[in-house]
Amino acid sequence: MGVIKKKRSHHGKASRQQYYSGVQVGGVGSMGAINNNIPSLTSFAEENNYQYGYSGSSAGMNGRSLTYAQQQLNKQRQDFERVRLRPEQLSNIIHDESDTISFRSNLLKNFISSNDAFNMLSLTTVPCDRIEKSRLFSEKTIRYLMQKQHEMKTQAAELQEKPLTPLKYTKLIAAAEDGSRSTKDMIDAVFEQDSHLRYQPDGVVVHRDDPALVGKLRGDLREAPADYWTHAYRDVLAQYHEAKERIRQKEVTAGEAQDEASLQQQQQQDLQQQQQVVTTVASQSPHATATEKEPVPAVVDDPLENMFGDYSNEPFNTNFDDEFGDLDAVFF
């Protein structure tokens, strides 16, 4: 279906701007002409002056003619707004070509490209040796990678051309290789350069002739008795277990004492808190203690109450809960 072109109508905002853009009138103000069908206030008044006995524009406009012209002009404006805002009929709605031209051009381009691709795939004979693999990287990416490779090679060459930075102990290493300095002198030189290091000369002490130290390190070298594994070993093992049990009991006793101390401390704290609460309540209600100390009068049975029976002990039941118990529970 072809698209029918139609003359573009004025937009609502543009038409209102055109409607209210007035022409400067001397002594009256700015009154705008909507279009050729809606005149201005001045021209409308001049045309209607003849109805009231005036002889043209030279006779001027009085207040009555201006009021009538203003009323007629307002009426024409209202009629114009009413016609402008009236909805169009569905049969008369036709799209403008500019609304669909971009979509149509894009659709036509896609159709032509897909048709060419399909024809190339179905009709064109391509030799197998002409079919090449697709590129893994685009040309832009390949150029970037080649540039980075060139920069890395340049940096490596520059590093090789730079002179070697002397190490911290270069002179000492050279002296050690030449043998011109003794080991002790080189060690002293290292400690002199690194002032944060410290050492103590002759710090190693050799105890070759100390029998007590040697005996402690070697242990007891005496031979065990013949009945060691039958009798002595059992005694040693029993002593070991007894010592271990004593240590355990001591730890348990210390733990129990600590728990009792913590429990007593907690009880004291609770007692202090209760005393504070009682003191606070007593200070807030001074008449409470006096009320509690007052004697309670004894209940004396009235003979008139027992005249018709002891109704106070009988259950009071009106069957209200059986009928309206659920309703009462809802409200209360």
UniProtKB/Swiss-Prot annotation:
UniProt keyword annotations, A-Z: Activator, Nucleus, Phosphoprotein, Transcription, Transcription regulation
GO cellular component: chromatin; cytosol; nucleus; SWI/SNF complex
Keyword Mitochondrion: no
Compartments where found: Nucleus
Primary location: nucleus
Alphabetized CDD domains for the sequence: SNF6
Position of sequence motif Nuclear localization signal: 2-8
Region (Disordered), start-end ranges: 278-299
Record keyword Lipoprotein present: no
Record GO biological process: chromatin remodeling; maturation of LSU-rRNA; nucleotide-excision repair; positive regulation of transcription by RNA polymerase I; positive regulation of transcription by RNA polymerase II; regulation of transcription by RNA polymerase II
Molecular function GO labels: rDNA binding
Modification type Phosphothreonine: residues: 165
Subunit and interaction comment: Component of the SWI/SNF global transcription activator complex. The 1.14 MDa SWI/SNF complex is composed of 11 different subunits: one copy each of SWI1, SNF2/SWI2, SNF5, SNF12/SWP73, ARP7/SWP61, ARP9/SWP59; two copies each of SWI3, SNF6, SNF11, SWP82; and three copies of TAF14/SWP29.
Task of the protein: Involved in transcriptional activation. Component of the SWI/SNF complex, an ATP-dependent chromatin remodeling complex, which is required for the positive and negative regulation of gene expression of a large number of genes. It changes chromatin structure by altering DNA-histone contacts within a nucleosome, leading eventually to a change in nucleosome position, thus facilitating or repressing binding of gene-specific transcription factors.
Further remarks about this protein from its record: Present with 2900 molecules/cell in log phase SD medium.
Full protein name: Transcription regulatory protein SNF6
Organism: Saccharomyces cerevisiae (strain ATCC 204508 / S288c) (Baker's yeast)
Source species taxonomy: Eukaryota, Fungi, Dikarya, Ascomycota, Saccharomycotina
Name of the gene this protein is made from: SNF6
